[in-house]
Amino acid sequence: FNTFINDGSTEAFNKGEFKETSFFGDPNSSFMVKYTFGEKMDGLFNTPDVIQQDNLGIAAYMKPAQMLTALRDVVLGKERFDAAFAEYIRRWAFKHPTPWDFFHTMENVSGEDLSWFWRAWVLNTWKLDQTVKAVAYVDEKPEKGVEITIENLEKMVMPVAVLVKESNGKEHKINLPVEIWQRGAEWRFNVPTTSEIKEVILDP
């Protein structure tokens, strides 16, 4: 938790007066992907003496902090995450909690089943790779809207934020919940566009 809390406290202290560039920088950078989701990365559930030396800093600090940031910003939202995190601290202060105690508290207070999240981030070394597979106009006419197909290429699943830009300047922001992946690796949805599509962006 140390890196995650440090990053948040630096941003919040004195209304951000001394805020520095986030520890994470650009979360989509090749550096983050290479070390957090690399082929040789160890699982977070391994004990430190089992984790490879080159991966220890990532497994102990960077990936857990990145995981908690994703849980707060993408999955639960700041309000629910902060309430659940505060309750975890209240329940387990001066005690000896296990990772399962943290998992259960976050789920209990937030009211969400997060088993899919822990399975991907903690219990396994799965990767996240989502893509736009197809874009097709309804009846082949741009003014009738568009059907977009997205695909999850790896085992990790996450909610999807989509930005659709039209040639006429209009933009559509769609937030799809993680449950869309329960029925398979592809999901189709329609957007009521009225002109040709300029761009479709995931996680804008």
Which residues does each PLM region occupy?
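Hydrophobic alpha-helical and helix-loop surface patches within well-folded domains
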Residues: 1-151, 200
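Beta-strand-rich binding/interaction modules
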Residues: 128-131, 135-203
